[in-house]
């Protein structure tokens, strides 16, 4: 709470999950899937102890997803369906979750780097007009990640459910001209894993079994350090084979798919996406930065988001960066490689890093009136109020 007794809410709206809670807390109060579902047919009124309503949101929608037509209001970090997004926010602020009177609260929201201004304007409009928050702030996710890590300068590799961003931040300011995005993230890896399991002969349905396969992915997938070696092991031995019990009791065996699915992050052509993978993109981003800042960036690479949680990802990233640096900068001169310092930080709680950074920032700023856009300012200026964030509004 701030000095006037107003609650300060932090809401990190991801493509796949909403993480929400209060300023100063060190963990989100609620984490739930960012989905909205509508029943395909109205046959039963209840399943187990969940009542089927015309509109199901979050956890309930996730549990009954096989009976619903499911929509994700956000795609690749950007809101695509505003009506459904409002349902999601109603659920977040309503009795099911935070249970707050929005008129007496301030809210800190997060957005991906390179977010279209229109998207941000609309978010602010909804927050003030529909929910009547007393103050609103919109922070860039990569900057929050660095705050949570206690840094002001670094490169954030943020890979969530819908989009992967590589975002250099210098002295607390994100550098949009250097920010790169890769439209491969958790959801695409899950889809690819479904495809690989289908090739193995297991019948998975792309929508009904999506959650099941996501769980398999989270439990068993990893990033291979040396891909040729992993493929050899997969072909010639059974050391990689793990059993997994599905919710209905069937047991499946998963082998080479464990590293083949996340490999798409490093080799996008595997899932028919053009462009370079995450390691090369990171290398290109740092090399495009000012020569004086490059060394700082190489020493402060911070991973963030659920799709960076694969075992083996940090070491593979480091290996590829060193390889690229050796080939392209040192032109193969191995002697000089020992001077090349690189550090990849993989904090254990990186799944919720953006929320944690937001909770820290909102707590520090809760009583600083010139930080927040206020309802009064919005009534006077409309969306021009965003100029307070240092955003030019045409």
UniProtKB/Swiss-Prot annotation:
Keywords, sorted A to Z: Actin-binding, ATP-binding, Cell projection, Cytoplasm, Cytoskeleton, Nucleotide-binding, Nucleus
Q: Which residues bind ATP?
A: 160-162, 214-218, 305-310
Does the record's keyword annotation contain tRNA processing?
Answer: no
Classification via PROSITE patterns: ACTINS_ACT_LIKE
User: An example of a Gene Ontology BP annotation on this entry?
Assistant: Arp2/3 complex-mediated actin nucleation
- Where does the signal sequence lie? none
- Localisation per UniProt entry: Cytoplasm, Cytoskeleton; Cell projection; Nucleus
Query: What SMART domains does the annotation carry?
Result: ACTIN
Annotated GO molecular function terms are:
actin binding; ATP binding
One cellular-component annotation, GO: nucleus
Segments spanning the bilayer are none
Functionally, this protein is described as follows: ATP-binding component of the Arp2/3 complex, a multiprotein complex that mediates actin polymerization upon stimulation by nucleation-promoting factor (NPF). The Arp2/3 complex mediates the formation of branched actin networks in the cytoplasm, providing the force for cell motility. Seems to contact the pointed end of the daughter actin filament. In addition to its role in the cytoplasmic cytoskeleton, the Arp2/3 complex also promotes actin polymerization in the nucleus, thereby regulating gene transcription and repair of damaged DNA.
User: Family per UniProt?
Assistant: Belongs to the actin family. ARP2 subfamily.
Self-association or partners: how does it assemble? Component of the Arp2/3 complex composed of actr2/arp2, actr3/arp3, arpc1 (arpc1a or arpc1b), arpc2, arpc3, arpc4 and arpc5.
- Its recorded name reads Actin-related protein 2-A
User: Which gene is the coding source of this polypeptide chain?
Assistant: actr2-a
């Amino acid at each position: 709470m701030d000095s006037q007794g107003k609650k300060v809410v932090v809401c990190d709206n991801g493509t796949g999950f909403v993480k929400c809670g209060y300023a100063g807390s060190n963990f989100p109060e609620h984490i739930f899937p960012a989905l909205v579902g509508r029943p395909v047919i109205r046959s039963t009124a209840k399943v187990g102890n969940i009542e089927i309503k015309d509109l199901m949101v979050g956890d309930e929608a996730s549990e009954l997803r096989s009976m619903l037509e499911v929509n994700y209001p956000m795609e690749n970090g950007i809101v695509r369906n505003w009506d459904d997004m409002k349902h999601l926010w109603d659920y977040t602020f309503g009795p099911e979750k935070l249970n707050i009177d929005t008129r007496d609260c301030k809210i800190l929201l997060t957005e991906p780097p390179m977010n279209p201004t229109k998207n941000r304007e609309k978010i602010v409009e909804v927050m003030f007009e529909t929910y009547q928050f007393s103050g609103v702030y919109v922070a860039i996710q990569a900057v929050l990640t660095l705050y949570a890590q206690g840094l002001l300068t670094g490169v954030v590799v943020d890979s969530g459910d819908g989009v992967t961003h590589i975002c250099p931040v210098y002295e607390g300011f994100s550098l949009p001209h250097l920010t790169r995005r890769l439209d491969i993230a958790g959801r695409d890896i899950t889809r690819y894993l479904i495809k690989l399991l289908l090739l193995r002969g297991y019948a998975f349905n792309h929508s009904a079994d999506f959650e099941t396969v996501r769980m398999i992915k989270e439990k068993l997938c990893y990033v291979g350090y040396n891909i040729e070696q992993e493929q050899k092991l997969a072909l010639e031995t059974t050391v990689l084979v793990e059993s997994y019990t599905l919710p209905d009791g069937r047991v499946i065996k998963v082998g080479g798919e464990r590293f083949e699915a996340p490999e798409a992050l490093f080799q996008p052509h595997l899932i028919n996406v053009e462009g370079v993978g995450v390691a090369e993109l990171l290398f290109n981003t740092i090399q495009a930065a000012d020569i004086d800042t490059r060394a700082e960036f190489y020493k402060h690479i911070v991973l963030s988001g659920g799709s960076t949680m694969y075992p083996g990802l940090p070491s593979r990233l480091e290996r590829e960066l060193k390889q690229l640096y050796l080939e392209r900068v040192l032109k193969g001169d191995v002697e000089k490689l020992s001077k090349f310092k690189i550090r990849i930080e993989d904090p254990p709680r990186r799944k919720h890093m953006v929320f944690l950074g937001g909770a820290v920032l909102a707590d520090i700023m809760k009583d600083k009136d010139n930080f927040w856009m206020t309802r009064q300012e919005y009534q006077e200026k409309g969306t021009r109020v965003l100029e307070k964030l240092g955003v030019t509004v045409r």
